[in-house]
């Protein structure tokens, strides 16, 4: 397939600051006022490009918490993103969604090209701020054919009631949320129940994430890709050839 542009940024009125007071004094003042008003809105949110036609392949959204404390985890994750499309070449399209700096700043077009996905991941940097998983879930809900959202994160700092509503809607649509939960920081463990609550509502699950074990992460992502294409049936058929399949199936069984 032909790749679309990397990502498109759109205004997010809810998170944009109020416009600066009008100034007088000529062209320079008017220019400063315009920049103050428009730049925060332009860079506040991201969504994938508008779609033409109906997707022909299953889709997966690879979502990552790239706040400042997450740099070690993101460094590990960006090295193995290609596993998502290499597991079943040509059978799954993947989009990269990233939040950092208290906003979703990246939501790429869907692609099944491993090099394209790796290049897009390489360009992401971590920024300090609160988590923004829910806007990623909301945007994913509007996309067609998304079978799985796999999210790497440690804490949840948003509205749980809103998260539950989104998770219920994703579940009705047939989109599973799979969370790779990083508990390297002991304070993150308190959010395990929250992530399980959201994931189970979609029919998904939560697995532990270890930034120091990139090989295991690659195995898990490969298994998630197979699950996105063929569900539990295909995952069970390939469990002997996929090192991550057994772990994923074990955690999927825990949701029941």
Task: List each language-model region with its residue ranges.
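Acidic, polar low-complexity linker/tail segments
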Residues: 2-61, 68-75, 90
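Von Willebrand factor
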Residues: 55-152, 156-161, 184-191
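Conserved beta-strand scaffold positions in the cores of enzyme catalytic domains, especially
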Residues: 96, 177, 203-208
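VWA/integrin I-like adhesion module and closely mimicked acidic/polar interface patches used
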Residues: 155-201
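C-terminal "exit" segments of structured domains
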Residues: 206-256
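Loop/turn elements at helix/coil->beta-strand transitions in domains of secreted/extracellular proteins
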Residues: 90-93, 144-148, 173-178
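Extended, alpha-helix-rich binding/interface surfaces that flank or overlap catalytic cores
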Residues: 137, 146-153, 192, 196, ...
């Amino acid at each position: 397939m032909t790749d679309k542009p990397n990502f498109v940024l759109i205004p997010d009125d809810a998170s944009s600051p109020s416009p600066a007071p009008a100034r007088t004094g000529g062209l320079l003042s008017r220019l400063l006022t315009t920049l103050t008003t428009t730049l925060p809105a332009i860079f506040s949110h991201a969504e994938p490009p508008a779609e033409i036609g109906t997707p022909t392949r299953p889709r997966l959204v690879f979502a990552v918490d790239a706040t400042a404390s997450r740099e070690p985890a993101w460094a590990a994750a960006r090295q193995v993103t290609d596993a998502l499309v290499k597991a079943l070449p040509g059978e799954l399209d993947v989009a990269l969604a990233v939040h950092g700096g208290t906003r979703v700043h990246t939501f790429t077009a869907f692609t099944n090209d491993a090099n394209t996905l790796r290049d897009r991941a390489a360009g992401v940097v971590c920024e300090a701020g609160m988590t923004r998983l829910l806007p990623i879930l909301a945007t994913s809900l509007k996309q067609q054919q998304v079978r799985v959202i796999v999210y790497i994160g440690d804490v949840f700092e948003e509205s749980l009631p809103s998260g539950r509503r989104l998770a219920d809607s994703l579940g009705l649509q047939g989109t599973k949320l799979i969370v790779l939960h990083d508990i390297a920081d002991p304070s993150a463990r308190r959010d395990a129940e929250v992530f399980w609550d959201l994931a189970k509502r979609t029919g998904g699950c939560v697995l532990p994430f270890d930034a120091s074990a990139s090989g295991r992460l690659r195995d898990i992502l490969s298994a998630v890709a197979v699950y996105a294409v063929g569900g539990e049936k295909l995952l069970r058929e390939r469990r002997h050839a996929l090192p991550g399949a057994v772990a994923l199936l074990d955690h999927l069984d825990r949701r029941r």
